[in-house]
């Protein structure tokens, strides 16, 4: 299947291109390694780094992405352009700030591992959750749609924010309601090594019923 970009020169994208770019716009950024893995999931199987680089180079030529070397000896970062966002129906687009980029990439890694394309689990982005939740509610970094339709809120904790702030965020997510029940059946904290102990301690101070709904695990590395 071929999908035409709405431009005067009408360059064309494959269905896999379109699916990958949709994912990338939703996540706002990913590493070149993550995009290469994603392309394999969306196609017939894993592809080489060289093949992934060729596909991303074509997207760059079409003005749909930018590749930037942000950190020394780390994979380049791929960010969609406004043209890619417009193709996906967005009227506005803003790249992730450098200060939040590492956090964004970890969220992309979690989605890629936990909710890979074709799996039985789905994913809601932070922006999608913001549209769902009432004003003033705590917005998680994402949410896993479990096979039974239940939502698991996902929080990425890479740096210490202090026990008080962690407790406020945790209890806020646990308290979000949907009808007569909890919107989030569980809250999953994925933590850098330096903050696992702190987040676990905050969880362990909660009442037993609330503790049972909070899972604390190491954050996947990039």
Language-model features and meaning:
Residues 108-114, 176:
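Metal-dependent nuclease catalytic cores in nucleic-acid-processing enzymes
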Residues 205-222:
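Charged, structured surface patches that assemble and position nucleic-acid processing machinery
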Residues 91-107:
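A short, highly charged nucleic-acid-interacting micro-segment common to nuclease
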Residues 46, 131-135, 194-196:
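Acidic-and-aromatic substrate-binding clefts and catalytic sites of carbohydrate-active enzymes
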Residues 68, 100, 112-153, 158-165:
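Active-site metal-binding core of divalent-cation-utilizing nuclease and nuclease-like domains
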Residues 1-89, 94:
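Nuclease-adjacent, charged terminal/linker segments that flank catalytic cores
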Residues 158-208:
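Catalytic cores of nucleic-acid endonucleases
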């Amino acid at each position: 299947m071929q999908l035409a970009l709405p431009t005067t020169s009408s360059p064309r994208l494959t269905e896999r291109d379109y699916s990958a770019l949709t994912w990338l716009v939703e996540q706002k950024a990913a590493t070149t390694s993550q995009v290469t893995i994603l392309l394999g999931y969306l196609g017939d199987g894993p592809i080489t780094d060289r093949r992934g680089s060729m596909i991303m180079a074509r997207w760059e030529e079409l003005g749909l992405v930018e590749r930037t070397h942000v950190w020394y000896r780390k994979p380049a970062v791929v960010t969609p352009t406004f043209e890619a966002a417009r193709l996906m129906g967005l009227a506005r687009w803003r790249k992730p700030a450098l200060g939040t980029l590492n956090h964004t990439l970890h969220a992309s890694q979690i989605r890629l591992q936990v909710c890979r394309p074709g799996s039985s689990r789905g994913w809601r982005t932070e922006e999608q959750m913001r549209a769902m939740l009432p004003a003033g509610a705590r917005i998680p970094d994402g949410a896993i749609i479990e096979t039974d339709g239940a939502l698991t809120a996902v929080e990425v904790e890479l740096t210490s924010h202090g026990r008080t702030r962690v407790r406020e965020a945790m209890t806020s997510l646990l308290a979000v309601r949907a009808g007569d029940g909890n919107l989030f059946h569980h809250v999953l904290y994925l933590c850098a090594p330096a903050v696992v102990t702190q987040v676990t301690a905050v969880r362990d101070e909660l009442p037993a019923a609330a503790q049972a709904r909070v899972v604390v695990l190491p954050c996947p590395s990039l």
